[in-house]
């Protein structure tokens, strides 16, 4: 089984590399152009942040850390092949991030997409094997999968229905002093999304939003305001599905006493506006000037979306939470037709 997984890994690398189209030499510039942007994306995935130095030396290091060797080809070909391997995968094999998320979920029933690839693998090895193992990150991921999910990890096409309601929480405290218009906001999925026994988004998956208005407390007792619009849910893959605070999400939020309590504790007199009033966003007014980390929000998918999920084997299906995520609730998470 170990040899089979290694052969599949090697084939995936070669397939991704063979699919790369050659770009012009103008892409490889020292002016922060596409070549630098692609490499920074790779380094952010692998290490958590971009590194310093020349393009070639940085790419060589990343390839050795992920594959255990340097890939052949031009700089552009190698970068594209590596990014595809990390994020897209092939027609027969899901991406490394997809596999990693499934393995992480199998270990702890949640994922940490905000962590670097290296940290996520180190953490799983410590939990499963007692200590951090050496070697290429891709090989270490495959070894973990062999131990945790010996049948392997494949991606299954799944449709997420429109108005699928999901529960999220703020990853950081927002105040009228530490945010400004257009700032990105990250929330985390509180409950996993499972559709027809396919894991689509584990607990801990990210939901992205942005700040659309900030007003500090003003004269004559006028309250402070923070206005936030929701953008996308990141499912395993990683792919993004557009979300907003529509009517279904608003009803779920109003029905959940825990959510009402969390919001009320952060802002007195909070006001929820539906998609007509806020383009799918959320407005808070009150005398306090912060929205606490952990504050709960419901959002919903704006339309049906085709994504990929992981078909959960019957022997571990008990790890998932059963229910209907489209209902206004705070505990169920599975969609069945």
Q: What name fits each language-model region?
A:
Residues 14-17, 277:
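Alpha-helical transmembrane segments
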Residues 26-146:
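Alpha-helical, heptad-rich or low-complexity scaffold/stalk segments
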Residues 154-330, 334-337:
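Contiguous beta-sheet cores, especially beta-hairpins with glycine/small-residue-rich turns
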Residues 12-13, 264:
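Short, linear, compositionally biased motifs with a strong N-terminal bias
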Residues 1-10:
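Bacterial N-terminal signal peptides that target proteins for export
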Residues 2, 24-26, 337:
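Low-complexity, Gly/Pro
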Residues 16-24:
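C-terminal segment of classical bacterial N-terminal signal peptides
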């Amino acid at each position: 089984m170990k040899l089979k997984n290694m052969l599949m890994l090697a084939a995936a690398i070669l397939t991704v590399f063979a699919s790369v189209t050659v770009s012009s030499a103008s892409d490889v510039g020292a002016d922060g152009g596409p070549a630098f942007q692609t490499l920074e994306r790779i380094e952010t995935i692998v290490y958590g942040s971009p590194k310093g130095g020349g393009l070639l030396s940085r790419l060589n290091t990343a390839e050795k850390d992920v594959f255990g060797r340097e890939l052949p080809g031009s700089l552009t070909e190698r970068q594209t092949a590596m990014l595809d391997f990390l994020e897209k995968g092939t027609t027969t094999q899901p991406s490394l991030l997809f596999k990693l998320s499934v393995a992480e979920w199998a270990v702890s029933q949640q994922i940490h997409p905000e962590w670097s690839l290296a940290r996520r693998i180190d953490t799983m090895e410590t939990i499963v094997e007692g200590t951090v193992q050496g070697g290429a990150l891709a090989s270490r991921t495959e070894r973990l999968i062999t131990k945790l999910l010996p049948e392997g990890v494949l991606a299954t096409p799944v449709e997420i229905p429109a108005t699928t309601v999901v529960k999220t929480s703020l990853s950081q405290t927002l105040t009228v002093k530490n945010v400004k218009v257009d700032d990105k906001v990250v929330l985390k999925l509180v409950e996993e999304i499972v559709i027809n026994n396919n894991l689509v988004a584990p607990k801990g998956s990210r939901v992205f939003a942005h700040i659309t208005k900030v007003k500090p407390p003003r004269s004559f007792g006028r309250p402070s305001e923070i206005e936030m619009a929701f953008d996308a849910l990141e499912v395993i893959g990683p792919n993004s599905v557009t979300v907003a605070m529509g009517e279904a999400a608003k009803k779920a939020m109003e029905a959940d006493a825990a959510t009402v309590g969390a919001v009320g504790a952060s802002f007195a007199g909070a006001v929820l506006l539906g998609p007509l009033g806020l383009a799918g966003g959320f407005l808070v007014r009150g005398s306090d000037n912060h929205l606490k980390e952990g504050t709960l929000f419901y959002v919903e998918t704006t339309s049906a979306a085709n994504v990929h999920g992981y078909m959960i084997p019957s022997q571990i299906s008990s790890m998932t939470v059963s229910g209907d995520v489209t209902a206004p609730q705070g505990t169920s998470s599975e969609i069945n037709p």
